[in-house]
Every structure is written in structure tokens, then in C-alpha cells.
Swiss-Prot record:
Identification of the protein by name: Nudix hydrolase 8
Annotated organism of origin: Arabidopsis thaliana (Mouse-ear cress)
Names of the cofactor(s): Mg(2+); Mn(2+)
CDD domains (alphabetical): NUDIX_ASFGF2_Nudt6
Gene: NUDT8
Residue span of motif Nudix box: 225-246
Binding annotation for Mg(2+): 240, 244
Length: 369
């Protein structure tokens, strides 16, 4: 008998589809099939069957296989004594590895996903049935970019996009059909910072961006940027100023923040304006991002037509001047630990006067030391 390439055969248990690229001199040597398998006609290794019957006959690229009365198998009319139709090196798993979350749902272990798309499809369906039977709620499925071919399979099973990062896409599935989904939505905001760096000569550190909208070409503006993941607002402001201008600074306080909507890809934006004390004055620009940077007299800065006509920025300047003359007090970070999660976090607030600990009061602190 001619050898049979297992790349021509699709075997399904539940809805598992296995395609192999190896040929054997003896047909299906070292391979077995369970009577629980139900089989389908295929048109190559990528064929997928959605059949749910339990017929014991299937067709491969060069012929057909049928169950015999003695629980053996027959191919093209020839009895196969071997009852093996799956490589012993490939041990089938029926469910995806997952662990429970705090809210009655499950999180799939993305480090243990099967590499075979057919196996993934079968295990995903079986897992959904198992989780539904156990009364689970939401399912979180993180698919690394290296296994992006699994994304359309999950989408076909009813998963939805939640968010994506550089190395993965996160999908979700809400199991209870009679209940609205309680899974939290993707992050709705981006967080930016601007560094208002003022020296003792009342000069403000400003930059001209290398790439900007034509309407603001030539505008001198504050160094700005986005907060990185797990980065504090105050450290992000110091970092952005250093990266763009080379000037070292010390965080003083958040003097104001702006909340705007539909800023980028329909996301909202939180922009924190931070007053920073300069610790150096030498400017070394980031040539990839910044066209120019300099120390500019505050009076000259606010007289720029675009700045002068901007009511919001005019108010920011007024707040900064009020802070310098002790008529205003911004928000300073205080590290505290909450019993809810046991983790330290930054709570921003101001203290006008603390008789027990004068150093605790940020409002009485001179901006220039």
C-alpha cells in the first residue's frame, strides 16, 4: 500500500482539527483514533469541519477510512489492525489552561496556548462549555503577536476586542447570555504632562517641536509628553523636560490639569501642568523631536499671538504667578498605602498650614530655594 501523508488527514475530537506534515511508510503507523472521534471530509490541512455527528467514516486526500465491526479501521477496503490514528508524541488536551479571577471569571494562561490553530479551536469551544457549566462570568484571553493566527478563531467563537498593546491583543467573552456584560471597558483616557520650568530670572524653558501642525509652526511652547506605563505624574514631567531639553529639574507641584474629550482616536485626555524648579540651565535638545529650545522671558512668552489669544493658557500663567506670590497653592504627591489593595500610591493634595509638622505644608514653601 502507498504511504499516506498525514497532512492530508483532519481528525476531529469535539472540534479539534489536527494537521501533520509527516509521511509514514506504514499507513498511520503509531497513530490511533478513539471511537469518540467524529470525522469529516477535508480539502487539505487547513480544512475545518463544524459537523457534530458521530459518523465513523471520513475522507482524506487519497481515499476513505471506515470503522470495522471489531473496532478496527478499514482504508479503501483494507483492514487496519492498528487502532492508532494520533501520533503518540501529540497528546491531546481538551481544555485551555486558565485560572479564576476575583470576579467570578477566568483568565486564560497565554503562556500555555496550543500552537496548533485546530487544537486551539477545539479546546476553546470545550473550555467555553466547561466554564458555562461552572457558572463562570467573563473570560480574558490574551493572544501574543506570535500567535496572531488564533485571533480570527476566537472572534468567530464570539470573543470581542478589548485592547491591544505592542506585543499582544486582549480579547474578552461574557458568558451569561441573560445578563449584561460587567467586564470593564478599555482605558478611556490618555495622560499627558507639561513642565512649567521657571528660573530666578523669571525665564521660562520653552521648545519648538520639530513635527507639529502647520498652525503652530514657530510657536514656543512648554515641554510636554505622555506618562509611561506605571510612571508617576511628577516623575513623568521631570523626565519629559530632561529628554527634550537636557535640563535637570525638581518637581514642585501640580498647578492645574485639563480634561478634554475626543482628543486622539475618540479617547479623552488628562493633561497635568506641573511647576518644576530648574537644577541646571544648560540646554541640550533632543534633535529627533525638538527643533529648538531656550530660556525665554515670561513676559515675552505670554505675548506670542497664539498664547495671548488662548484663555485657558492665560489662566495657567495667572495661576503660576499667583503661586510665586503665595496667593495660590498647587497639589503635591503624598505616598500612602490603602488597605483595599495594600499597595502604595500617590495622593495629590495641598496643606496650607500644619502646626504639628510645618514641613508637611507645601503652600508655605518658597518656590525658589
Amino acid at each position: 500500500m502507498d504511504s499516506v501523508s498525514l497532512s492530508e488527514v483532519t481528525v476531529i475530537k469535539g472540534t479539534t482539527h489536527l494537521g501533520f506534515m509527516h509521511s509514514f511508510r506504514q499507513p498511520f503507523c503509531g497513530v490511533k483514533i478513539s471511537p469518540k472521534f467524529y470525522l469529516s471530509k477535508v480539502d487539505g490541512p487547513k480544512a475545518i469541519s463544524s459537523s457534530s455527528n458521530t459518523k465513523s467514516q471520513f475522507v482524506y486526500g487519497g481515499g476513505s477510512i471506515a470503522a470495522t465491526s471489531d473496532s478496527g479501521y478499514k482504508m479503501n477496503g483494507v483492514n487496519l489492525k492498528s487502532r492508532t490514528l494520533m501520533s503518540s508524541a501529540v497528546k491531546e488536551r481538551s481544555l485551555l489552561d486558565a485560572y479564576d479571577d476575583e470576579y467570578g471569571g477566568v483568565i486564560v494562561d497565554h503562556g500555555k496556548l496550543p500552537s496548533n490553530p485546530y487544537a486551539f479551536a477545539s479546546m476553546l469551544r470545550a473550555s467555553l462549555s466547561d466554564w458555562r457549566r461552572k457558572g463562570k462570568k467573563g473570560v480574558w484571553l490574551k493572544l501574543p503577536v506570535e500567535q496572531s493566527e488564533l485571533v480570527p478563531i476566537a472572534i468567530k467563537e464570539g470573543f470581542e476586542y478589548h485592547h491591544a498593546e505592542k506585543g499582544y491583543v486582549m480579547l474578552t467573552y461574557w458568558i451569561p447570555e441573560e445578563e449584561p456584560s460587567m467586564l470593564p471597558a478599555n482605558a478611556s483616557h490618555q495622560v499627558g504632562v507639561g513642565g512649567f520650568v521657571l528660573n530666578q530670572h523669571k525665564e521660562v524653558l520653552v521648545v519648538q517641536e520639530k513635527y507639529c501642525a502647520p498652525s503652530i509652526t514657530g510657536l514656543w511652547k512648554l515641554p510636554t509628553g505622555f506618562i509611561n506605563e506605571s510612571e508617576e505624574i511628577f516623575s513623568g514631567a521631570v523626565r519629559e523636560v530632561k529628554e527634550e531639553t537636557g535640563v535637570d529639574t525638581e518637581f514642585s507641584e501640580v498647578i492645574a490639569f485639563r480634561h478634554a474629550h475626543n482628543v486622539a482616536f475618540e479617547k479623552s485626555d488628562l493633561f497635568f501642568i506641573c511647576m518644576l524648579r530648574p537644577l541646571s540651565d544648560k540646554i541640550i535638545i533632543d534633535a529627533l523631536e525638538i527643533k529648538a529650545a531656550k530660556w525665554m522671558p515670561l513676559a515675552e512668552f505670554v505675548e506670542q499671538p497664539m498664547i495671548r489669544g488662548d484663555k485657558m493658557f492665560k489662566r495657567v500663567i495667572e495661576i503660576c504667578e499667583a503661586r510665586l506670590s503665595h496667593r495660590y497653592c498647587g497639589l503635591s504627591p503624598h505616598r500612602l498605602v490603602s488597605t483595599f489593595d495594600g499597595k502604595p500610591s500617590s495622593l495629590y493634595y495641598n496643606v496650607v498650614d500644619d502646626d504639628h509638622d510645618p514641613s508637611h505644608s507645601n503652600c508655605s514653601t518658597e518656590f525658589y530655594r
